[in-house]
């Protein structure tokens, strides 16, 4: 299984290449109508009002978000080095659509750990897309506890556009399926996080979430419970789709 956590992809070599890649957009470019701006909120669970409870909903959600366990495996999988600090960590993403597989890099460029307006305890991180990604932009994932009510939310905030370097075939596919799949991804992230938190607090098994992640030599495949499948060799793989 060495070096092949994403089917037939040499993920060790692919991750090494990401070290030299830059973010593929300039913040000054981010403006409507050329870019999409999305905020997706979903309820994770509830605690008593006040600071996050030890071993409670907020802490469970924070740990799952930290490890990128909430990603829906039917749409996105990822490999990264657990030993790398969270800030600056590179992730190799595998985007999955039918028999197509897209391999792209992102980098975590910001961490959030704060209390806002004395009303919300927030923890999260932001990743930005790297050169040759299918998209351009950033996503911020946050776990938010409303201190007055005890409600815990998962918030995904995204600024994105299709990479202009994408070829004509992928451009056509994006026109029909890209935006729809993108929105489905964020909905599924919220659903999965809710299910995983509930499972972690009650001991209820969850498919593709009840097992430990596949890990060798510090390289982790997430979400937990997924592994390369023999049929992966029949998929159509696109490396660096935004080249």
Positions of predicted regions on the chain:
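A conserved amphipathic terminal alpha-helix motif
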Residues: 170-216
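Hydrophobic ligand-binding cavity/cleft-lining segments
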Residues: 1-98, 229-243
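Acidic, Ser/Thr-rich low-complexity intrinsically disordered segments
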Residues: 204-243
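Hydrophobic-ligand binding "helix-grip"
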Residues: 99-151
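Beta-strand/loop substructures that line and gate deep hydrophobic ligand-binding cavities in soluble
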Residues: 130-178
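Hydrophobic, Leu/Ile/Phe/Ala-enriched alpha-helical segments that form helix-helix packing faces
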Residues: 61-72, 112-115, 189, 193-201
